[in-house]
Structures are given as structure tokens and as C-alpha cells.
Amino acid sequence: MNSPLHSAHYRIPYFCLKLLAFIGAQAFLTYSASAIPNAVGGFLAQAESPLNDTEIGDRLLDPELWAGQLELPGTWREEAPIASVKGSYLAARPKVMGLPAIMVQARHREGKLDSLAITFADAGSYFGYLNEKLPPGLSPRQQQAELQRRLAAKQQQFSSFFRKTETSLRDTLRELTEKRPRDNHIGKTRTLRAEVIDYQKGNLALRLLVGNQRLIRLLIQPVDSISREWLDTDRSAMSTSALSRVYEGRVTKPDNGDVLIGTLSIVPQGYKPYCGLNTLTMAARYFGLHLDEDWLAVAGKFQNTGSAAGSQLPRLYLAVAREAALDLHKSNDFSLNEARKSIDQGLPVVVWRRFSGTRNKAHSRQTLMAAKNPDYRIPRPDTAARDSWPDHKSPLHASVVVGYNPSRTEVLFVESWAGMKIPRRMRAEEMAATAYLTFYFKP
């Protein structure tokens, strides 16, 4: 199922297309234009709340809310932080400015509301995984024709929904705000630059982001806090040496000999083909970038197909590094020594590697055994163990290496899905043997 990347030299991590095939098929068949983004694992699709289908736009713009005199409406659930900024999302499906909101997210800085983000359209959650389940008895040509027919119909539906949503939101913002809107942008790099339109209502900036027929999002924050950078203002104000100290301070060394970055939060990919994007998002948020997988999909030129085919992922890694005032080394293999140098400085390493469900179970088992017994070591791989490792025919998948154990020759890594609260473990030899492409972040 591997499909060529835009560059002839690299292929996209495609295990993402198979991991949750059943969930993906259900999503394709049942989720509507207001399908739920992957960050909450589909929870909102079933969330029961008195705010469902209820207009809350006025409450989100209330000056008393931003002055700290009122609480946000509804029940909020925690999500991955960005630097020192805490993140949460509303456990409801309300309306905002007369339109159904796919997701409402909040950011709090030192206990005070810092910004809101309302997503109105997102192709990644609308298309989900490509549904390949077809009626029996079709010839290969008929199968291809049926898939194309289904996809074309879904693309037409989304295009119409996207166009109507954008037009309605622009009209509402124009009527709602007092001043003439201004063109602006977010991002220092050309790859991640987002063109936005800034509207103003009182002391609030209403920043409209429309991304290439994939994403419609409204950002709300005080006028005096808007920025043209993805990097959090606390981080962008730091010197290079101060930033280095922040990252180095995240490295822990428990008694079992691990060297570990302890504060990299998981951003679950849900039913989207986004393992390469979500692992990068996890690193980006750790660096203090206000990025998510949905904008990265726009910047990476993902198509509205329910697949990662044709996207341009590798260039996003360098852009993320540049936005975070870091450097990047891309390699066709995995070097434990080079990974150690990055991790020692508090910088994670993203690895595209060959994936096997059998080996994934083995990694989980090894991880749990090590958690129960601090003296446990993964055995040195013999010929039989090496023969069980996935080869070049196996699907690709992206993981984030966040630690290592030098005396045990083990690496610790996290995935873009839930299920284990501690980093997984494997022998460094296996990571090196199965790695396809490695991204080392550097100071």
C-alpha cells in the first residue's frame, strides 16, 4: 500500500491507512460534513451536551469572558499543551455565528484565557480514511471505477459545504466587526506561512484562516496579543541559549539508566491517515509552536482523497525546525549515537520505520515488563528475532524517539495513538534495521 511521495526518493508513512481500517470505513460511511477532527478520537461525535446545536458565539465574544469575570460555557476536556499554554476542547457540538462548529478549542496562559479556535470545516476529518470496502464480484476495473465514483461524490459534497461555509462566515464577520478587515499572515517560513484576514470587534481580533479547500478556522484573541509567528510568544522572546536550557531541562535520568524527554504529549491521530503529521505535531507543540495536524496537512498539500498520497511531508520537518529556531538533519538511516546527541539536548527524533503488528505487540509486552521489573532487559537479538523484524515490503509508520538506555542498547519511543501512558521500548538494533527516514532536530 506504499505510494510514492512527491520526491522520487521518499515514500509516505502509510501504515496510517491500515491501522484503524474498520474505524476509517465507518467514518467514511457515517460521518457528515461536520465530522469530528482526529485530536479527540471521535469523542465529539457521540458527546451529549445541552450546548449541542446551540448558538454560543455571543458568549465567546463577551468582554467579561476575556476579562476573567465569566467562565467558558460547557464542559471542557484537556488536550496537548503548547509550551506553557494549556489546551482544552469543548465537549459539545455547538453553533458559532450561525454555523455548526466542528470543534471549539481554548488556550489558557497562567490560568487566563489566551485564545479560542473554532474549526468550521476540515477535510481530514470529513474524508477520514479511504474506504476500500467494495461489493463482491467486481473486476479490478469496476473496483477502481466504483472508488472513483464514491470519492468524486464526496469531494463534490465537501466542496459545496466548504464554499457555503466560507461565504457565510465572511458575511457574518463583515457585519459583526467595526473596522475594515486587514490581510495578515502567520509563519516565518514559506512552507508553513498561513494567509489570514484579521477582523476586529472591540478589543478582540477575529482571525480567519482558510486553507486550500481543506480548512476553515476562526482564531479569537485580544488584539494586543496577535502574532505573526507560530512560535509561542514566551519562547520567541528567548535567546538561543535560553531556549537550549529549556529543552535540556526537560531531560530526566531515572535510576534504571534511561535518558528520557519526559514532557512530550501525545496528539492522537484518530481515523485520519496522519501518523506522519501527528508525530510532527507532537514535536512542534513540544517546541512551543501553535500548530496542529490540520494546518500541517494544508501546508503539506494533502489532497481531499482520504489518503496521504501526493502530499509533501518531508519539507514540513525542516519548516517546523525553522519556525522553532532549530536546525534539522535528515538521514536515510537511524544512528543511536546521533539520536543520543539530540535527546541529551532535550530534542526528540522522528523516525519513519517499517511496521509490523506482531512486533508492535512485542514492544508493548517488553515495555510493560520493564515497567514492572527495573532490572528487565530486552534480550540481545538473535537470528530468529531479526527474522521477525519487518522488511522493506512492510508498511511505513512514523514514531517519535524520546529516550534511550545506553547500558541496555534500547530506545524509547511514543506513537500517535492512545493506549500506553509510558514510552514504548525496543532494541536500538531493531530501530536501525527498520528505519527508512530519520529526522534529528538540532539546536
Where are these regions (language model features)?
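N-terminal secretory signal peptides that target proteins for export/translocation
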Residues: 1-13
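Bacterial N-terminal signal peptides
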Residues: 16-27
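Active-site-adjacent structural segments surrounding the nucleophilic cysteine of cysteine proteases
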Residues: 33-37, 42-44, 48-78, 82, ...
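A cross-family detector of function-defining hotspots
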Residues: 36-128, 146-235
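Extracytoplasmic
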Residues: 111-113, 270, 346, 394-398, ...
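Noncatalytic regulatory segments and standalone regulatory/sensor domains
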Residues: 219-224, 228-230, 239-256, 374-443
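Solvent-exposed loop/turn segments at secondary-structure junctions
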Residues: 270-274, 282, 301-307, 334-336, ...
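Predominantly the structural core of cysteine protease catalytic domains
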Residues: 308-404
